[in-house]
Amino acid sequence: MRWWLAGLVLVAVLAGVIYFTRPRSAATSQEAPQQASLSSAGYVDPAICASCHADVWETYRRTGMGRSFSQPVLSNTIGDNKSAPTFYHKPSESYFTMLERDGRFYQRRYQIGFDGKETNIMEKEIDFVVGSGNHVRAYLHRTSRNKLVELPLARYAEKGGSWAMNPGYDHQDHPGFSRTITYGCMFCHNGFPEVPAGSGEAGADTVFPGRLPEGIDCQRCHGPGGKHAQAAESGAKPGEIRKAIVNPSRLSPERQMEVCMQCHLETTSSRLPNSIVRYGRSPFSYRPGEPLGDFMLQFDHAPGSASPGGSYDDKFEIAGAAYRLRRSECFQKSGGALLCTTCHNPHDIPRGGEAARHYNGVCSQCHDAAVKQLAASGKHPQSTDCIGCHMPKRRTDDVVHAVMTDHYIQRRKPERDLLAPLAESHVTEDNGYRGEVVLYYPQDLPNGSDRELYLAVAQVNQKSNLSAGITALTAAIDKYRPGPMQFYLELADALRDNGQMTKALPIYEDAVRREPNSLPALRKLGVALRSSGQPSRAIEILKRALDLAPADGATWHELGLNYVDQGSKPEAIAAFQKATELDEDPEVYNSLGAVLLESADLARAEPAFREAIRIRPAYAEAHSNLGNVLSASGRFEEARYHFEAALRLNPNYAAARQNYALALARVNRFEEAQRQVEAELKSDPGNAVAHDLLGNLLVARGQVKPAASQYQEAIKLRPEFGRAHLDLGALLADSGDVAGALPHLQKAAASPEPGVREEALQTLGLLGKAR
């Protein structure tokens, strides 16, 4: 009897269960509806301004704001040499270069693959350049669906010009060619663009279908210029012409500052959130002269909070000039006299020696007498480089290759080297700030619904203060019953993130009842239903979402995952293929490959996994899945390459280690396979699957008693583990202990896994015949 049972156990070792992990649903996106018109809001082509304000127009065009966004040309991409050096990024083992072909510009990435040749090649055309070059230039690509994505390599002004990765990219698994430019990004880096109607909804897709402005224009600080231009062209009186436009210098000090603070008050660029645009406001609806708090609310870390580098109180980030200025005693005690425009003429920036004289002259208006007195007593240098000592240049915490003037006016210059190189901190959901989020601006927001609701949302929006935020947001919603659906969606998301899906699900349902045509709400409800084991209902909801937005790749992906859960593989494959046609999303390709792998369609699974890796080379799941395909196809050495890549990327990836062990067993490297499984059990002794696999490997090496112990441990950890019952039953029967084998084989025969159930029934049948 031993011959066939031993063969059964060996099949379990060599074939095994193919493990793979399907990813979470992709980020939200939305079909672009009809565009809203800037002209209807009173905006005009900013070039009209030049007809009356030619001098200001010419000087402003040379400022950083005037050059903030542009078309690619030789000078702002690869330089006059028509070539750029290849940049090697060690953490991701990737090579990047900038290319020019026939007057068009591209950014290219490649890696060195298993065969020593270039692999994972990605090349995208540069459609736009963001940044003036005073500090940094980044490069954007516009997709066929009018999304803007940031390309990984940037050009920094430091060291006379140098190439380095964009902020947030200096680590192994960076965003690659997939970082989407949001409306929040565009708000501060360019003039207002045309955007789809309904763009203010949380989770709405960020698409830019029209012609984009080239640089921050006059109307960002002066408001829509249509009425002003019309009045001037019609010969209206000077007073009427002036009244038709916002002149920031005629606003109150508070409103004047807010014109600048709409973009220069960023409390932090790391996960917090730093600001929330009020629900119901579209992303480009702020108008100079209105209270900034009517458009957005600004938030900050709680005072005294510890940061990885010390304290968040002293954070110095690239878009926080006004944030730092507001800390200064000079500002706080000026009574509104010290504004951004006290030092800065936004229309014309002084340069070189003229700049030093200008800024020092501004300081002298208040401090001249005191400085002379201190200099006479030997307590102050005779020279008056005010800025160099009291507002020194400093390397920014968030863009570590950029050096900026610190607008915190200090009595004494810090003693440390402010320009010393900094390593980029890699902030994730797992290691980000965990603490209270406080309202920063406007500080005088009165108690009531706005304060309570938005402050509660700030706690949960990026998981900074999840438990307390859930309590506060629940109470605020119960108290005020707000109209905007987004409050309910935020609460549902927070409950989901806190592992309370049972409580989240009815709130997602409520959000959809409030806005039945909200694509983000429908998709999130679909995800929640799937997580709650209701794929049929989820499919119904997701089909409603696709009726609204048939070209939404994320919804097609989620639909496919529900079909997988239902066991409807052909429908799942069709949904995933549709999603791949719409978005270049590695998770979609991995999901497609996974269901093809489950269907034993290795020929089609392999290119799907390779495409997932090409898009995201540091995708551990896709490497492991490709390793499974290659191992099953008899290409062990290449399979080993991908399994080891998966484990380098994620050393704690249990499924990859187990799959690697199975691949080693397929080529009779049982000792190596055993070491892999033992390493997994060392880090996770409670992994029942690993104990079962180790038992199979021990059987293959003739170590029957230790194998039985491993099967027993697997069953102890998971009493209903059908595969372990099958393996132990087969081993006992093979050893002649049929009585001991029968209970385990009978348990396996009742397994919900069809393969385990069929093997157990077959074995029981053979045992019956043998007896």
What residues fall within each predicted segment?
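Terminal, low-structured helical/coil segments at or just beyond the last alpha-helical repeat
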Residues: 700, 734, 740-771
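Alpha-helical segment of the N-proximal tetratricopeptide repeat
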Residues: 445-479, 490-493, 497, 561
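Structural signature of tandem alpha-helical TPR/SEL1-like repeats
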Residues: 465-472, 497-510, 531-544, 565-578, ...
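Hydrophobic alpha-helical membrane-insertion segments, chiefly the h-region
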Residues: 4-21
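Residue-level recognition of tetratricopeptide repeat
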Residues: 448, 483-484, 518, 552, ...
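Structural marker of alpha-solenoid helical repeat scaffolds
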Residues: 479-480, 514, 548, 581-582, ...
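Primarily the internal scaffold of c-type cytochrome electron-transfer domains
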Residues: 30-31, 36, 55-132, 138, ...
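Conserved alpha-helical positions within TPR/SEL1-like repeat arrays
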Residues: 489-493, 520-530, 554-564, 587-597, ...
